Regions:
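Extended hydrophobic leader/signal-anchor segments used for secretion and membrane insertion
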Residues: 1-112
Length: 112
């Protein structure tokens, strides 16, 4: 079963919580920060990120950066003493900041 949520930034905490519980979610993004990859209100299928999930540059992920939830791209990955750190940003060159893997809750597997 795929849960369905509307992504609206800070309020998208519920989607992150469901992903942390292992649920695959259909999330509808609002805004133009990811155009032309994603259009506003275009749904995606987001799977939970687990220890086995491979994260790469250009993956679209649901994550939390500085208290806000984003459906944005991984722009860069750097090794750290405890794993890796991921630079999150939109599709227009704005960088939100670096996060640890524990702040990445889901990965987009399909754009609908």
């Amino acid at each position: 079963m795929i849960m369905e949520y509307t992504y609206s930034g800070f309020e998208n905490r519920a989607s992150a919580e469901h992903l942390q519980q292992g649920e695959t979610c259909k999330i509808t993004g609002i805004g133009n920060s990811m155009t032309p990859i994603l259009k506003s209100k275009q749904p995606v299928i987001c799977e939970p990120v687990t220890e086995e999930t491979e994260l790469n540059k250009k993956d679209i992920v649901l994550c939390k950066v500085k208290g806000h939830y984003y459906l944005h791209l991984i722009h860069s990955i750097k090794p750290t003493k405890t794993g890796s750190s991921y630079l999150i940003g939109n599709n227009h060159g704005h960088m939100n900041g670096w996060v640890s893997r524990s702040q990445i809750f889901g990965i987009v597997r399909e754009i609908l």
